[in-house]
Amino acid sequence: MLDPNLLRNEPDAVAEKLARRGFKLDVDKLRALEERRKVLQVNTENLQAERNSRSKSIGQAKARGEDIEPLRLEVNKLGEELDAAKAELDTLLAEIRNIALTIPNLPADEVPVGKDENDNVEVSRWGTPREFDFEIRDHVTLGEMHSGLDFAAAVKLTGSRFVVMKGQIARMHRALSQFMLDLHTEQHGYSENYVPYLVNHDTLYGTGQLPKFAGDLFHTRPLEEEADSSNYALIPTAEVPLTNLVRDEIIDEDQLPIKMTAHTPCFRSEAGSYGRDTRGLIRMHQFDKVEMVQIVRPEDSMAALEEMTGHAEKVLQLLGLPYRKIILCTGDMGFGACKTYDLEVWVPAQNTYREISSCSNVWDFQARRMQARCRSKSDKKTRLVHTLNGSGLAVGRTLVAVMENYQQADGRIEVPEVLRPYMNELEYIG
């Protein structure tokens, strides 16, 4: 959520920055609501002051032996007017907040302006795509050859966009997640966490999934039953529970940065993806991901983004997978991000790069929703922290990349050296 003071005092500047994202801010409506808020605020404060004054007069009149009934009636009437004014103000403030919750984050100044993914800017490349001297098989064909990917069984159990993994393919999937966790915890300084896969609505509001993206989630009960404490949603990413661990907390600055990682399944309805990537593991309703989250001082967040992106890159480099790094343009960034790098891995069967990691600096956008603050040791003042999140990596898509990039002419799949300790030193699948 954006700073309310910024929306009040600099709406035109905010609107200009949001326009870079393709978001039209209704400045006139915001101004009208703000003017109304000021009037109601003053009216409420005046009624409160008048009621307090009259209440004090009752005691004074009583001490003088005067009839207090007229004053008592007046105080009661003022109380009713005050309650009505407060209710009207609360309704207006709720309307302003609901609007604020639908406004995306401001893009950082260095983010390239653009409309969609076609305007993203490539930053660098690592590795050279392998040249094959045989017909390339895609991961679905390879998975079926080794009885490792069973989409038909998943359709029987659940439906489309699910998979049953078996045998050595399932083992490699597990090995990838273990390798990623070990790398991030042992070399990159993250603490491993196990988190709930179901979260409440406060948690989803904290990281920005609600109210705007309710349709992308799997809910245990209809969304309108929000007040019920047992109404949960499956997590779309471990970013949600990990980041919310600091909700309503004040953290001493010398405890920052906080670096957390978790391996979880992720659940997404893919509501806007009908007809896209219908074959294979690229776009699933349920997929595994190793997530990285950092909680940092505001002045450290841009450097932390570079560091976190480097941590995701290291996974790909150690696996020997060619990839490219791009900076997302304003029109392609996620709702809460102020700056995002995507890593795209080479997928031979598609002859293209596909997203495998997204690393974002969210600035204080989530922290304001969560009221997550840090305290300076010198002056004891508090301020909002900055939060960052990144995929390190999406496990299923990494499996796709390994299977296709390491395939052999006879259909066997070479196991990357860094994964062999997790697979009893197995060199080939098949």
UniProtKB/Swiss-Prot annotation:
First-level EC class: ligase
Keywords, comma-separated and alphabetical: Aminoacyl-tRNA synthetase, ATP-binding, Cytoplasm, Ligase, Nucleotide-binding, Protein biosynthesis
S-S bonds: none
GO cellular component labels: cytoplasm
InterPro entries xrefs: aa-tRNA-synt_IIb (IPR002314), aa-tRNA-synth_II (IPR006195), aa-tRNA-synth_II/BPL/LPL (IPR045864), Ser-tRNA-ligase_type_1 (IPR002317), Ser-tRNA-synth_1_N (IPR015866), SerRS_1_N_sf (IPR042103), SerRS_core (IPR033729), tRNA-bd_arm (IPR010978)
Positions that bind ATP: R268, S269, E270, E355, I356, S357, S358
Pathway: Aminoacyl-tRNA biosynthesis; selenocysteinyl-tRNA(Sec) biosynthesis; L-seryl-tRNA(Sec) from L-serine and tRNA(Sec): step 1/1
Pfam families in the cross-refs: Seryl_tRNA_N (PF02403), tRNA-synt_2b (PF00587)
Enzymatic reactions: tRNA(Ser) + L-serine + ATP = L-seryl-tRNA(Ser) + AMP + diphosphate + H(+); tRNA(Sec) + L-serine + ATP = L-seryl-tRNA(Sec) + AMP + diphosphate + H(+)
UniProt GO molecular function: ATP binding; serine-tRNA ligase activity
Enzyme Commission identifier(s): 6.1.1.11
Organism superkingdom: Bacteria
Biological role: Catalyzes the attachment of serine to tRNA(Ser). Is also able to aminoacylate tRNA(Sec) with serine, to form the misacylated tRNA L-seryl-tRNA(Sec), which will be further converted into selenocysteinyl-tRNA(Sec).
Family (UniProt): Belongs to the class-II aminoacyl-tRNA synthetase family. Type-1 seryl-tRNA synthetase subfamily.
Entry comment, domain topic: Consists of two distinct domains, a catalytic core and a N-terminal extension that is involved in tRNA binding.
Subunit structure: Homodimer. The tRNA molecule binds across the dimer.
NCBIfam families per record: serS
Protein name listed in UniProt: Serine--tRNA ligase
Gene behind the chain: serS
